[in-house]
Swiss-Prot record:
This is Arabinooligosaccharides transport system permease protein AraP. It comes from the Bacteria. SUPFAM superfamilies: MetI-like. The lineage of its organism: Bacteria, Bacillati, Bacillota, Bacilli, Bacillales. Part of the ABC transporter complex AraNPQ involved in the uptake of arabinooligosaccharides. Transports alpha-1,5-arabinooligosaccharides, at least up to four L-arabinosyl units. Responsible for the translocation of the substrate across the membrane. Residues 87-302 form the ABC transmembrane type-1 domain. It is a multi-pass membrane protein. One of its GO terms (cellular component) is plasma membrane. The gene is araP.
């Protein structure tokens, strides 16, 4: 008999090894990491990396083809009247927008949430439309409404009411009023939707029990509505603060760089002016870092005052 030739036998991967990666992919331990990976990657690429880069740039003098380390020179250069004017304008603008964009949307949301109001969807749509309007278009509309001519809409109304016309665009006080009014007009609808969403989560049984106990409207508002709206209120407060410190478009479309008494100069506008218009990238980066710190501090203070750091017991 001829000997039987045998070849090299290669081991076939076991089913367990073949399904190893599949089991890891579908395992409960890996699922949280897989779902959070897109957010973590986007956070690292679009948030953390730019912050680190800007922080490094704030200690440098950046010129075309030349980068030199200057230490704290960019930060010490912030000690000037123009920077303090921009900081004060930003704080004042943020304060007045908070005064408008927190209580007014809350009251309007309660009004729209009432069953007695007809055509609620029409009102909701009408209030949300300004948020979809381009800032440039909104700025042009406001420049026409509040023009310096007596024939402008705002001055025509004042004349009919017996008041003298105002030079809205060239006065510091009316200039701040215009910026706050423009921001309030644009973002009022969004805050209303936030509060409306919060009102939908308030149990109706609590209001019914309060009616049985004889509670009036104010007591129901203070002891039922407000406590349940606290998370939404804190969120709206936080994004409104951040939006206030980020303000640039409203001022730019109204005056560009020629606002009366520099009333339209904000921290973001000052950053744009120094970093891009004057090509002082290092100095602009220092302004950006200071802006980030101010936003973090103010946001933490607002969260602390609202009691968000207290443990629920």
């Amino acid at each position: 008999m001829k000997p039987v030739k045998t070849g090299t036998v290669h081991p076939v991967p076991s089913a367990a090894k073949q399904s190893g990666w599949r089991d890891l992919f579908y395992s409960k331990k890996a699922a949280p990491y897989l779902f959070t990976a897109p957010f973590v990657l986007s956070f690292l690429v679009f948030f953390l990396y730019p912050i680190i880069s800007v922080f490094i740039m704030s200690f440098q003098r950046i010129l075309p083809g030349e980068v030199s380390f200057v230490g704290l020179s960019n930060y010490t250069a912030l000690n000037n009247p123009t920077f303090y004017t921009a900081l004060w304008n930003t704080l004042e603008y943020t304060f007045w927008t908070l005064i408008v964009l927190i209580p007014v949307p809350l009251l309007l949301a309660i009004f729209l949430n009432s069953k007695l109001v007809k055509f609620r969807n029409i009102f909701k749509s009408a209030l949300f439309i300004p948020a979809l309007t381009s800032t440039i278009v909104a700025g042009i509309i406001f420049r026409l409404i509040f023009g310096e001519m007596e024939t402008s809409l705002a001055n025509s109304i004042l004349l009919k009411l017996g008041f003298s016309p105002q030079n809205w665009m060239n006065n510091e006080h009316t200039g701040m009023f215009l910026m706050v009014l423009l921001a309030s007009w644009r973002w009022m609808g969004i805050n209303i939707l936030y509060f409306l969403a919060g009102l939908q989560n308030v149990p109706k049984e609590l209001y019914e029990a309060a009616d049985i106990d004889g509670a009036n409207t104010m007591k129901k508002f203070l002891h039922i509505t407000l406590p349940f709206l606290k998370p939404v209120t804190v969120y709206v407060l936080t994004i409104s603060i951040i939006g206030g410190f980020r303000m640039f478009e409203e001022s730019y479309v109204l005056w560009q760089n020629n606002s009366p008494g520099n009333i339209g100069l904000t921290l973001v506008g000052y950053l744009y002016q120094q970093g891009l218009a004057y090509n002082e990238m290092g100095y602009g980066a220092a302004i950006g870092i200071v802006l980030l710190i101010v936003i973090l501090v103010v946001s933490l203070i607002s969260l602390k005052l609202s009691g968000s750091f207290k443990g629920e017991g």
